[in-house]
Amino acid sequence: MNNIPDDFKKIASSSRLPRKYCSSESSLSDDDGHEIEHVLKHGAPEEALTPDTERMVVLGQDVVQSAPASLVPGGNLSWMSKIKSAGASMMGSIRPSSSSQDVHSTGEIEKHSKKKWKARLWSTWNNIKYSSTWMSDRSDEYGGENDVVFLGRRYSTSVDESGLRSGFENFCSDYYSRLWITYRTDFPALLDTDTTTDCGWGCMIRTTQMMVAQAIMVNRFGRDWRFTRRKRSHVAAHGDEDDFDREKIQEWMILKLFEDKPTAPLGIHKMVGIAAMGKGKKAVGSWYSPSEAVFIMKKALTESSSPLTGNTAMLLSIDGRVHIRDIEVETKNWMKKLILVIVVRLGAAELNPIYVPHLMRLFAMESCLGITGGRPDHSSWFVGYYGDQIIYLDPHVAHEYIPIDINPNTNVVDSDSKKAKKCPEKSYHCRLLSKMHFFDMDPSCALCFQFESREQFDNDMRQLNLSQFIDIDQGEEHGMKRVRDPMFSVVYGERRQPPSYEREVSETEQAQADKHGFEML
């Protein structure tokens, strides 16, 4: 018990059942969900459209960042009614009218308009269902005796001598600096389909992108880098405009790796294209398991010609065994940095409590890239913990796709309104803190690490073995260092040949088997 984190001892002393803590979970009832689905499929009775509901539908990004006050539950008109009203207006716009028979007589125009508005309504529905905008500010839940452990860093949440919560503020800055890659709408169509959004099915791809983006950011800027949104006028006044531009350009170059367009080496178009080699058109709209998403990302990294990814290799283990020989091959004898992903199952139907201290230990490691997993059909990127709750970044928020231009003086203009669009940078950083109970986590997940050298890898694996968290196989000469409840095994020796149970079958045994109708295996 000496190796079990103090945080877990506090959890183990409590006998209460796990509760739901997911701060980005929707408050929709089942009836509300059915009503929305009915609106999506059949439309709703035409009603008056208020200014607030029109703003909610057309400005999809505003729904996420700053919902109108009139949409908050408890107003004069329920937000569900406004959703129906918005749906009625949008669906009504694609129905034939007596004043525009000449327009709707063209079937292709009607079909195109219907697809366009239905896709936008689906995006709005996903925003409502998954956005944490409807939840209250939970920053006051991070107070007391527990520390926040976040991707190898520990932050105190208590008030310091000056009366400030500087530790918690530093955690918020660190959390906000991580790249938050979410659903996108209105990007170029995927493959040869009309699909221009990944809402409802691309969450595991987005989760994997966030994990890899973290590795690239650490390689480029270091773990202590923090995102800043200083204005150019402020930067120019302090004389460091050139340095600011250089850093911003490098940051945007990393974002462009994951941009939602066909030419992005790690974007969703590239990943879906790789998946289509095996799935065909089912690659669009299909859910992906953690191992599938990582396998696709590994191939995308291998095919990437970007200098930002040239020194990075990825190794995926799906059987819970990491072979040092495989690592040496992938990294060319450690000439490249390693992203190591180990797919595990830490329980049958739910997370086994014995693995909670194991996960806590992982989040405290400098080499930790988090965990890709989530709840059933709801992928998330787990990045730390606070007490008995696991902290994560949720991709289930839809943002409008805006092209990324590394020229800081360039504005993107909307083709319809001819107005300049907002800088997309803000949508890649999340201010809303999301967390859930450890036991709400799906036991099927992928443990992610990044190692710069063989020395760092050996040291971390040795510490995990001494903490009774993993097995180490040192080869046939030196034997195994086993633990009671390992998450995975590291094999340093040559690949062991599985035991062979084959032997020659005698004529008598074969005759007996034939007589009784058995097959000799």
From Swiss-Prot:
Official protein name in the record: Cysteine protease atg-4.2
GO process annotations (BP): aggrephagy; autophagosome assembly; mitophagy; piecemeal microautophagy of the nucleus; protein processing; protein transport
A Pfam family annotated for this UniProt entry: Peptidase_C54
Classification lineage: Eukaryota, Metazoa, Ecdysozoa, Nematoda, Chromadorea
GO CC field: cytoplasm
Compositional bias annotation for Low complexity: 90-100
Record-stated family: Belongs to the peptidase C54 family.
Active site: C203, D394, H396
Key words, A-Z: Autophagy, Cytoplasm, Hydrolase, Protease, Protein transport, Thiol protease, Transport
Localization of this protein: Cytoplasm
EC id: 3.4.22.-
Function according to Swiss-Prot or TrEMBL: Cysteine protease required for autophagy. Cleaves the C-terminal amino acid of ATG8 family proteins lgg-1, to reveal a C-terminal glycine. Exposure of the glycine at the C-terminus is essential for ATG8 proteins conjugation to phosphatidylethanolamine (PE) and insertion to membranes, which is necessary for autophagy. Its cleavage activity is functionally redundant to atg-4.1, but it cleaves lgg-1 precursors less efficiently than atg-4.1. In contrast to atg-4.1, plays a more significant role in the later phases of autophagy and in addition has a role in autophagosome maturation.
One Gene Ontology MF term: protein-phosphatidylethanolamide deconjugating activity
Segments passing through the bilayer: none
EC category name: hydrolase
Disordered as annotated region, ranges: 90-109, 499-521
Source taxon at top rank: Eukaryota
UniProt keyword annotation of Disulfide bond present: no
